Amino acid sequence: MKEMVSSSTFRAPGGLGFLGPSKIGLIPLRNRSGVRSRVKYIAPKCAVSSARPASQPRFIQHKKEAFWFYRFLSIVYDHVINPGHWTEDMRDDALEPAELYHHGLKVVDVGGGTGFTTLGIVKHVDNENVTLLDQSPHQLEKARQKVALNGVNIIEGDAEDLPYPTDTFDRYVSAGSIEYWPDPQRGIREAYRVLKLGGVACLIGPVHPTFWLSRFFADMWMLFPKEEEYIEWFQKAGFQDVKIKRIGPKWYRGVRRHGLIMGCSVTGVKRSSGDSPLQLGPKAEDVEKPVNPFTFIFRFVMGTICASYYVLVPIYMWMKDQIVPKDQPI
């Protein structure tokens, strides 16, 4: 399933989503084999219902509280989350727009966690030219245990405040991280800042579901942006040639209905050197403020319940895929 949206023809709508066909934001559809045959164009459709504003953090969008969530998630991430939401085929497909065509490219993988996405990057780029950054020491410890990542620079850091000078990297990659950011616009602005002139940012993340129950759990749990939100954030940060590529397991025929932790790959090009033209105020989140233990326990339990729903959804979709004819939606 490969579908692309280009900002050259895309204009973010002012309403709640795409309500019908339009000449704006046309997507070329290809067949399942990925071979371009008779091309058909549609307008991208997102949930008509209003999503919870990105400025209102979900249960797992608080860095200090998420620290403990990551600690336990790191134990099962590669074995439980990835098989249903982030397979090797999906990873390689999603990284294709990043144009990792030369082994000498300097690449940063922001929010790289256990290093699953980094494993896809080092297929094309020399390990010593790759940096893996994440805020969770427990996730990074799992990455350090992967022999294939020997030589990769693995460091702890904040996606919204990258510890690098302006114009440092040729490629910026971030997969499965934006949904945890308290301020996604700030993180994408940082992506622009640390890239060199002509650099490409490739951000892989979830999509907002349309089914009411999935939408409820998504908005409670973490950030599931709409496609037009991704494009707006990239363009505001200064990126040009912004494109969206829809991704998902072949058996998961409900990416837009139920959402997916890895549902699209968004790319943009930095056409001017220097800092982003977007100026933002100070961070809204105070990570030094002590966490109320009762609030933390409530949020942690509720966040875990929401996460469990999205662990079960891929299993449900796989079972339906085995039953429902391939030419019918599920």
Swiss-Prot record:
Chief location of this protein within or outside the cell: plastid
Chloroplast intermembrane face of the membrane: 46-295
InterPro entries the record matches: Methyltransf_11, MPBQ/MSBQ_MT, SAM-dependent_MTases_sf, SAM_MPBQ_MSBQ_MT
GO cellular component, one term: chloroplast inner membrane
Keyword Cell cycle: no
Enzyme class: transferase
Pfam families: Methyltransf_11
Catalysed reactions listed for this entry: 2-methyl-6-phytyl-1,4-benzene-1,4-diol + S-adenosyl-L-methionine = 2,3-dimethyl-6-phytylbenzene-1,4-diol + S-adenosyl-L-homocysteine + H(+); 2-methyl-6-(all-trans-nonaprenyl)benzene-1,4-diol + S-adenosyl-L-methionine = plastoquinol-9 + S-adenosyl-L-homocysteine + H(+); 6-geranylgeranyl-2-methylbenzene-1,4-diol + S-adenosyl-L-methionine = 6-geranylgeranyl-2,3-dimethylbenzene-1,4-diol + S-adenosyl-L-homocysteine + H(+)
Highest taxon, organism lineage: Eukaryota
Gene Ontology biological-process annotations: methylation; vitamin E biosynthetic process
Annotated segments matching region SAM motif I: 107-116
Residues passing through the membrane, by range: 296-316
Alphabetically ordered keywords of this record: Chloroplast, Membrane, Methyltransferase, Plastid, Plastid inner membrane, S-adenosyl-L-methionine, Transferase, Transit peptide, Transmembrane, Transmembrane helix
Region (SAM motif II), start-end ranges: 152-165
Membrane topology label: Single-pass membrane protein
UniProt cross-references to CDD domains, sorted A to Z: AdoMet_MTases (cd02440)
Protein family (similarity comment): Belongs to the class I-like SAM-binding methyltransferase superfamily. MPBQ/MBSQ MT family.
Protein name: 2-methyl-6-phytyl-1,4-hydroquinone methyltransferase 1, chloroplastic
Organism: Oryza sativa subsp. japonica
